[in-house]
Amino acid sequence: MEFAKIGNSQMGLLVSGAVLFTVVPLIIAIVWTVKKKEKFTSILVGAACFILFALILEKPLQNILVFPTLMGLGDHAAAGFINARPVLWALILGLFPGVFEETGRLVAFKTVLRNRKNRETGISYGIGHGGIEVILTMGITYITYIAYAAMINSGTFGNMIAQVAAQAPEQEANGYALAAQLAAFSAGDMVIGVAERIFAVMFHTGASILVFYACRDKKKFWLYPLAILLHTVMDSVAGLQMAGVIALSPVMLEVVVAVFGSAVFFGGYFLLYKKDAGKEQV
């Protein structure tokens, strides 16, 4: 099959996106640490915990349960049961990041960051967690898209799709959809992606504030399961969209992310962080 060529305007947007999603998170991290005189290691811990709990632990286990063929495994009864039930499928896709990522925060604040009681620690962790997610999920994705676009223009993309289809037949259609998406990529698509990441980082920062105070004050430990619940619900909405249970426009889906991200961030910021001014232990 011959794919539509990727134009110069699309390539320019992809390159701009790759730079934006890799450089800006680093700038935010540096500005925050300098302005607040925070230890950069708190940000690094947030980034490291995202890599450990989300990428190394969560994703492989989720794939083994729901998408075994992506792991080179044979299909199994549990995967068939889950994939035949869209609502359950969406719930599991939301529950895994909710449990693993919020538990990652808990472990970090209870161990390597246990002696850092200043209120900025929660935000520093969130910047690290959210920032590395932007770099790895968007920055690297845009770099990959640039490579795919070059393959499409050189006529070698079809060979890659054939190789993917041989190992995971259900992913073949995604390859064709991606090629069409790249050919039609617009500035509006990038704006939506930027907005989604902004609100996602706000969510991660707010959730980090919640779990930080859950660890610092035993009476507020309920904030930890609350963070899991909020994370699960937000990601499950995206899962319901992917499963076809609901049909939201891209803009409406971003509105959902915006509502969750804003509510969690501003709730944590004003109800916990701001009220703690001058009270934190040094």
Show the residue positions of the predicted features.
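Hydrophobic alpha-helical segments at protein termini of multi-pass membrane proteins
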Residues: 1-282
